Swiss-Prot record:
Modified residues (Phosphoserine): 15, 40, 47, 54, 176, 196, 497, 511, 516
Residue runs in coiled coils: 220-379
Keyword Coiled coil found: yes
UniProt name for this protein: RING finger protein 214
Annotated region (Disordered), positions in chain: 1-59, 104-134, 146-197, 486-552
Signal peptide as annotated in the record: none
SUPFAM superfamilies in the cross-refs: RING/U-box
Sequence positions bearing N-acetylalanine: 2
Bias-annotated ranges (Low complexity): 493-504
Length: 703
């Protein structure tokens, strides 16, 4: 629509007669529009009224169309805004072009086109193409009019003829006819301007030969734009001034910092020079000191080498003298030591292992006795009605039983560890001494047990024999038998109705006193039937007392003596006991009759203890008034490994075996004893040193 209106405005351009009035202002055509009020007034005078009115109508139509379009499409606000901007810009450019049509030149048209190009709107540029061409046609007409004016021709009426009606419409210049009418040819694009030419084609006709000047304000917003421009100019000046002030401040600060940095640089350079000077001084001193030290080092090294050579000579001389003396002495001792070393080492090793095993058995025996006692009390406590006292006593005995078991396990582990170390070559003296475990006191007595377990003939235990004071024979020597002795049986067992009667007399010289072993019997049962076999001898039935035959050989004599000493046992039981003793000792050689009787008594006491484990002990001994004497079993162990420098000689046929090492004892190596026991001097050496009474380790008899 804007293109058609512009085409209409171009068609209504001033005629040649009107353009004749522009000849006077031909010099002003090259000036830009809006530079001065005089030029604008001259242009306003030269502008035809018809062009101004057409321009105003075109602007109003464009604005109305834009408003109607925005009202019809409210959804496309963003796109319409840009479109409206383009339309307004196009209106301004068209108005400028129309203003330039009267007095502008082709340079002005180029400025308008460049303005549209700067806006970057291709559609607006396309819409300005026909306007530009129309303005070019107007300029061409104005030139023709100026020619006519110069030639002082009479104004003629120019008639624009209508071109062809086909799709490619062109304005061709009309040859001036005889009446003086000239045609104006306007070159336009066939494709872009065909539609606008079809819509409106006007013919300009000069009807009046007079011209009148009129003033029309073609730019009504110039004052507003000037005010706005001045305001923007003021703001820009203020901003420029602020930026300039800030720049000056920054420059001042940078100058101050630069001065400080320069001053600091000078100081650092000065310090650097001083440090370099100090480094040079130190380097010189270091070089001097280094040279001095190297010189002294060379001197000291030379002296050291001389001294070492002298010392080496003296040492070599002394070593040779000592070696010669030692070599003579060692040659004399080497043969003797080599002969004795293996023999004595093996004997000491076996003696240490045997001593450790003996002590372990004795300690475990004591702990097993306490364990059986606790188990018996727990058995009776479990059979009683549960009360507060029984529960408390049960807990105490359970605690005691657990402690005893732990102690027994620890004792076994410690002795086994020591035995293994000795077998691996460790010295017994270097191993720590295994302390004797101390049992805590038993729990306190309660009265309810006496009330519950009353003596009755049906519950009375049957003891095969009663044991008096029996001393356990010793197996191995010990450091201090007094501190290691302990009773095997703490509680005492007896029959409530029939006390035992001891048998007087004991056999053997220097043998400990043995209590008579008498079998209990009642009026209602025969003596033979009331003697059960000792515990641990299962499968061997006690036979009735029968007359024994006379001993035939040495074994029969030994059995006869043992059966006389222990009449409660028969021959089969005694043979079994002797077999157990032989198995435990691996041999019975070297034992005297007194020692054999002691071992048999210990075995019988052990069997009796096992049998007594089925009866109440300790806390319920009031139910069994007949006491069972304790068996005192002191333990003996060597305190250190023994080195034996001596060498055994050839033993005669009358020599006996040592009770410790089980080897023949020469008369010169026999340790004098008050008893008949045979021991090496070296085997009993540490026992004699640690025992103040100098007693035999196998019997408590003094020397």
């Amino acid at each position: 629509m804007a293109a058609s209106e512009v085409a209409g405005v171009v068609a209504n351009a001033p005629s040649p007669p009107e353009s004749s009035s522009l000849c006077a202002s031909k010099s002003d055509e090259g000036l830009p529009d809006g530079l001065s009020t005089k030029d604008s007034a001259q242009k306003q005078k030269n502008s035809p009224l018809l062009s101004v009115s057409s321009q105003t109508i075109t602007k109003e139509n464009n604005r109305n169309v834009h408003l109607e379009h925005s009202e019809q499409n409210p959804g496309s606000s963003a796109g319409d805004t840009s479109a409206a901007h383009q339309v307004v810009l196009g209106e301004n450019l068209i108005a400028t072009a129309l203003c330039l049509s009267g007095s502008g030149s082709q340079s002005d048209l180029k400025d308008v086109a460049s303005t549209a190009g700067e806006e970057g709107d291709t559609s607006l540029r396309e819409s300005l193409h026909p306007v530009t061409r129309s303005l070019k046609a107007g300029c061409h007409t104005k030139q023709l009019a100026s020619r006519n004016c110069s030639e002082e021709k009479s104004p003629q009426t120019s008639i624009l003829k209508e071109g062809n009606r086909d799709t490619s419409l062109d304005f061709r210049p009309v040859v001036s006819p005889a009446n003086g009418v000239e045609g104006v040819r306007v070159d336009q694009d066939d494709d872009q301007d065909s539609s606008s030419l079809k819509l409106s084609q006007n013919i300009a006709v000069q009807t009046d030969f007079k011209t009148a000047d009129s003033e029309v304000n073609t730019d009504q917003d110039i004052e507003k734009n000037l005010d706005k421009m001045m305001t923007e100019r003021t703001l820009l000046k203020e901003r420029y001034q602020e930026v300039l002030d800030k720049q000056r401040q920054v420059e001042n600060q940078l100058q101050v910092q630069l001065k400080q940095l320069q001053q600091r640089r000078e100081e650092e350079m000065k310090n650097h020079q001083e440090i370099l000077k100090a480094i040079q001084d130190v380097t010189i001193k270091r070089e001097e000191t280094k040279k001095k030290i190297e010189k002294e080092k060379k001197e000291f090294l030379q002296k050291e080498q001389d001294l070492k050579a002298e010392i080496e000579k003296l040492c070599e001389k002394g070593r040779r003298e000592v070696w010669e003396m030692e070599l003579d002495r060692l040659k004399n001792q080497d043969g003797e030591i080599n002969r004795n070393i293996m023999e004595e080492t093996e004997r000491a090793w076996k003696a240490e292992i045997l001593s450790l095993e003996s002590r372990k058995e004795l300690l475990v025996l004591k702990l097993e006795e306490a364990e059986k006692e606790a188990e018996l009390h727990l058995t009776y406590l479990k059979s009683t009605p549960p009360t507060l006292e029984t529960v408390r006593s049960k807990q105490e005995w359970e605690t005691r039983l657990n402690g005893v078991r732990i102690m027994k396990k620890n004792v076994r582990d410690q002795f086994n560890s020591h035995i293994q170390l000795v077998r691996n070559g460790a010295k017994l003296s270097s191993l720590p001494q295994i302390p004797t475990p101390t049992l805590p006191p038993p729990p306190s007595e309660t009265d309810f047990m006496l009330q519950v377990f009353q003596p009755s003939p049906s519950l009375a235990p049957r003891m095969p024999f009663s044991i008096g004071q029996v001393t356990m024979p010793m197996v191995m020597p010990s450091a201090d038998p007094r501190s290691l002795s302990f009773p095997i049986l703490n509680p005492a067992l007896s029959q409530p109705s029939q006390p035992s009667s001891p048998l007087p007399g004991s056999h053997g010289r220097n043998s400990p006193g043995l209590g008579s072993l008498v079998s209990p019997h009642g009026p209602h049962m025969p003596p033979a039937a009331s003697i059960p076999p000792p515990p641990g001898l299962g499968g061997v039935k006690a036979s009735a007392e029968t007359p024994r035959p006379q001993p035939v050989d040495k074994l029969e004599k030994i059995l006869e003596k043992l059966l006389t000493r222990f009449p409660q046992c028969n021959k089969a039981q005694m043979t079994n006991i002797l077999q157990q003793i032989k198995t435990a000792r691996t041999t019975m050689a070297g034992l005297t009759m007194e020692e054999l009787i002691q071992l048999v008594a210990a075995r019988l006491a052990e069997h009796e203890r096992v049998a007594a484990s089925t009866q109440p002990l300790g806390r319920i001994r009031a139910l069994f008034p007949a006491p069972l004497a304790q068996i005192s079993t002191p333990m003996f162990l060597p305190s250190a490994q023994v080195s034996y420098p001596g060498r055994s000689s050839h033993a005669p046929a009358t020599c006996k075996l040592c009770l410790m090492c089980q080897k023949l004892v020469q008369p010169s190596e026999l340790h004098p004893m008050a008893c008949t026991h045979v021991l090496h001097k070296e085997c009993i050496k540490f026992w004699a040193q640690t025992n103040t009474n100098d007693t035999c380790p196998f019997c408590p008899t003094l020397k």
